[in-house]
Regions:
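Non-catalytic cap/lid and distal C-terminal segments of serine-dependent acyl enzymes
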Residues: 1-221
Length: 221
């Protein structure tokens, strides 16, 4: 759906020290049958997939909690189908997941699937979750951009409209933003909308925090 080769970053939990010292199977990973929960991580505008690994302790979290994480580049396209060879929505929902489930035996559609994003990636995480509620087990959106000015709402809808479509369902969404964030105004308005429409989802507002990895790292721990 992107018409080109792309790079991803994938973290799979390894054997812990006890397992490694007591395991003599040279094909341990080939024989391992455990299915890990999978987290798809979406970066912000102007950033790339490596930001997650460079700015957070996500690798150690994967090891400690036994879950896998995959990070992709957003290429400033908001994780939407902006075509003709920039169909990032279909890439994530079809190409990426098919590749992961088809090539790594410890990843399976039967295991829990989550999507997490920061800033532009927060928008993407919400959009993908709300349009695929049956597929995802949860969504984390940190400092999400909730109303991009140049998104064609007649084509993609608004996040508000997608929340209203799904409000009767048991939504598992975590929203968080710092009170010093430059998009705090629209975020407060969005939170008011969520409360007034009884969506069952509300923001966590964090005093002193801004729009940065320093804040986002603390939120994912």
């Amino acid at each position: 759906h992107l018409g080109r080769r792309v790079e991803i970053s994938l973290i799979l939990p390894s054997a812990n020290l006890h397992e490694a010292l007591n395991n003599h199977d040279k094909e341990y990973y080939q024989h391992r049958t455990e299915h890990f929960p999978l987290v798809i991580g979406l970066c912000g505008f102007g950033d790339n997939r490596k930001a997650w690994i460079n700015n957070t302790t996500i690798e150690s979290l994967c090891e400690k909690n036994h879950f896998a994480a995959c990070f992709i580049n957003g290429e400033n396209k908001w994780y939407l189908n902006l075509g003709p060879i920039d169909n990032h929505y279909d890439f994530l929902e079809e190409d990426l997941l098919d590749y992961l489930y088809g090539n790594f035996k410890n990843l399976s559609p039967e295991a829990p699937l989550f999507v997490i994003g920061v800033s532009m990636g927060g928008y993407g995480a919400l959009y993908h979750y709300l349009t695929n509620v049956e597929k995802y087990d949860g969504c984390v959106a940190l400092s999400p951009a909730t109303k991009p000015d140049f998104i064609d709402e007649s084509k993609f809808g608004t996040l508000q409209s997608h929340f209203l479509k799904q409000k009767e369902k048991d939504l598992h969404v975590f929203l968080s933003i710092g009170e010093k964030d430059f998009i705090i105004g629209p975020s407060r308005e969005f939170n008011t909308f969520l409360k007034e429409n009884h969506v069952g989802v509300e923001y966590r507002f964090v005093p002193g925090a801004d729009h940065s990895w320093t804040f986002w790292e603390k939120e994912i721990i």
